[in-house]
Amino acid sequence: YIYGLVADIADGMGLKFLGFDISGMEGMAVRGDLPENPLDPASDKKGLQIRTTGSPMPKALMTALGYTPVTVEWNEVYSATQSGMINGFLGANAGSAYNQFRDIINYYLPIGFAVDSNRIVVSGKFWDTMTAEQQDAFATYAKEIFDESIAQTKVEEQDYMDKLEAAGVEVIDMEQADYDALAQIARDNCWPLLIDTYGQDVYDEMMAFYSK
């Protein structure tokens, strides 16, 4: 469904969308003590302030989980975390958590809030000048990039989580039930915010598709 939605948006911009190049899944990092049951909305989060972007989506998720969301620019996250201005942050995949923050964080939760990815696009006008054979070649290559990026990301994410553990950062194990519970929290609290941007019809279609 998301592929089709992005393709429609790209088409409206005069672009031909061919696929995604995945680079990681965004998690949550915490400095200091981690609350008991950190992903249970009912547990006491002790007023922990977690950095998010200015987007209402991550703010809604953190609020639903019981944290206090704080907007901090990405280039200020390190100093804000180190100084105690914030207690943690949302938005780093495992590689980023290791490479940029391993010396100041104590916990990493691979919650998979969002996918870090690049979009593979070409000019719509250029696409229309191609033969069917050339278009097929581009589409095939884009699919290969997508498939390879998924496989590579799985390996790299695990490798970086192992490195985080070796560096003294505790990576919180998550079961499928944890991801299912988070997904439901997101559907209830974050997805309705999409209506203002994409409209009621898109929201209804998403809910129907992902509720199957």
Map each language-model feature to its residues:
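N-terminal secretory/targeting leader peptides
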Residues: M13-K212
